[in-house]
Amino acid sequence: MSVLVVGTVGIDRVETPHGERSDLLGGSASFAGLAASFHAPVSLNSVVGEDFPAHHRAIWEKRKIDLSGLQIAKGKTFRWHGQYEQNMNNRRTISTDLNVLADFQPLLSESQKKLPFVLLGNLTPDLQHSVLDQMQKPKFVVADTMNLWIDIARTRLLELLPRIDLLILNDSEATQLSDESNLVRAARWLRERGPRYVAVKKGEHGCFLAGPEGAFAAPAVPLEQVLDPTGAGDTFAGGLTGYLAGQKETNLSTLAQGVIEGTILASFTVEDFSLNRLASLTEKDIAARRRELLRLINPNP
C-alpha cells in the first residue's frame, strides 16, 4: 500500500565537528519520504520555492516518489542553518528563513486523500489537523512532533492524539508533553489520550515502543563515526511507516519490525551529510545492517 508523506522541504546549511556543507536537501518530508520509499510507494506533499534545485528533485525521482503534490510557490525555499556541538547530541539553530513555508497549506489531490497510510511529518499541529480533515478514512496515521509545538501549540497537539494511530517523539519531548519522567509512564499517559501506539526515540540508546499488546525496545546501531545527525528522526519515521504499509497487519509485532527498519535506515543517514548516504543505499547494504542489528537484539538466533 502507498504512503502519503506530508512535511517540510528545505535547503540546509549544516556545521558539524566533521565539516560544513551548504545548499543541502533537508526538511522532514525529504528524509521521511526517501526512507519510506525503500518499503512502499510514496506520494509527497510539501512546498518549495522557485529556487529549488533540479538536482535535489532528482533524488526523489530516482526512487520513483510521486511529486504531484509538491507545490512550487512564488518565492524562495525554506532554509535552515544549524550547528552541532562536539558530542553531536546538542544542536544550535543559527538561522531559519521560512520563506514559502510560511504560507504553506497542504492541499491534497483526490488520489492523495484516498491513500491508506499517512505520515504527518514535523509540521504545526494545525497543518497536521488540516491534512487529516482532507483524508478519506486512512487505515493508519503516524504523526511526528517536536518540543516547539509542545511549547506553543500544546492544546492543538493534544487534540491531534485521538486522530492518530502512532505518535513518534523523542524522550525529552515525551517527558515534556506528559510531565512524566519515566518513559513507561510517559508512553502510557500519551496512549491514554488517543494513539494506540507510541514510539519514543532515545537517540544513540535506541527506541521504546508501547502499545495495547505490550512493549518493545530496540537498540541503536553502534557506529564508529557520525557525520551529520540531521534528519535521522525523520528517516526513522519514514522507514517505520513505509514498512507498515507493506504489511497485512498493523500490530505490535509489525510495528516492532518497523522500528527495526526505521532504525536501520536512520543509522545510514547519520553516516554522511543530508541524504547523501540514504540516496546511495542498496538492498544489500540494508540487509547487512539488518543482520548486524538483529545480532544485537538476539545474539544467539
Task: Indicate residue ranges for each PLM-predicted region.
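Extreme N-terminal starter segment of soluble prokaryotic enzymes
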Residues: M1-L4
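Short beta-strand scaffold segments in enzyme catalytic cores
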Residues: L34, W80-Q83, G206-A210
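A short acidic, amphipathic alpha-helical/loop segment
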Residues: H56, L127-Q134, T155-E159
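Short, conserved phosphate/pyrophosphate- and ester-handling motifs at nucleotide-, phospho-/glycolipid
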Residues: A36, N170, G233
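Conserved N-terminal subdomain of the carbohydrate kinase-like
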Residues: I11-D23, F38-L119, L132-P138, A287-P301
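Conserved phosphate-binding/catalytic region of the ribokinase-like
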Residues: L183-P301
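Alpha-helix C-terminal capping segments
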Residues: A32-V42, Y243-A245
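Conserved phosphate/ATP/ADP-binding segment of small-molecule kinases
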Residues: Q136-F140, N147-A217
